[in-house]
């Protein structure tokens, strides 16, 4: 009786069963993430998949979220060159809009503020970078607006995870990824 009560109380306070039902699987290139059911998964295109994790700020370029990028998006990064871990990721050519405020442009390259290796499921390590990117006017005047860009790159799996909103849950979700 006491053991049953302790186990029941433990499940009640940890939320373990509720947590598993509050997620859904997202599979990309053999990697499966368990993401919250409330997150919206976009259609895959040549750049990858946009996963919307929250609301859409009025001035933001797009809704809060992150991208799962495959080989095509990795090979055609900034100015048509392959992704280079020595720079922030920017798909395409030309100026990049400032993520939190579309009135401005991203002032690349920004400042590297963290680097290392991070686990993405068992047996997979990603090259990890965090860049602080400032925003400027079209005439290159600084604005005081900035954002952080986090990148997990798995070169062997040809996956790049690109987060411009510093989602607090994403790191843990990636650590718990499974592979097929």
Can you say where each PLM-predicted feature lies in the sequence?
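Conserved polar/disulfide-associated segments of primarily extracytoplasmic proteins
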Residues: 45-168
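N-terminal targeting sequences that direct proteins away from the cytosol to non-cytosolic compartments
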Residues: 1-63, 147, 153-180
């Amino acid at each position: 009786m006491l053991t049953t009560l302790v186990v029941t109380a433990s499940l009640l306070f940890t939320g373990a069963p509720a947590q598993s039902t509050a997620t859904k699987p997202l599979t990309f290139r053999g990697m499966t993430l368990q993401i919250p059911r409330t997150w919206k998964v976009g259609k895959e295109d040549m750049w990858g998949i946009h996963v919307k994790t929250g609301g859409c700020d009025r001035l933001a370029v797009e809704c809060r979220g992150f991208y799962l990028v495959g080989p095509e998006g990795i090979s055609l990064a900034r100015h048509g060159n392959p992704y280079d871990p020595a720079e922030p990721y920017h798909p395409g050519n030309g100026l990049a809009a400032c993520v939190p405020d579309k009135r401005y442009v991203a002032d690349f390259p920004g400042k590297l503020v963290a680097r290392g290796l991070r686990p993405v499921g068992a047996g997979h390590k990603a090259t990890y970078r965090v860049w602080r990117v400032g925003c400027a006017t079209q005439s290159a005047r600084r604005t005081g607006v900035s954002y952080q860009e986090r990148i997990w790159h798995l070169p062997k799996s040809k996956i790049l995870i690109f987060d411009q909103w510093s989602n607090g849950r994403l790191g843990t979700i990636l650590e718990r990824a499974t592979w097929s």
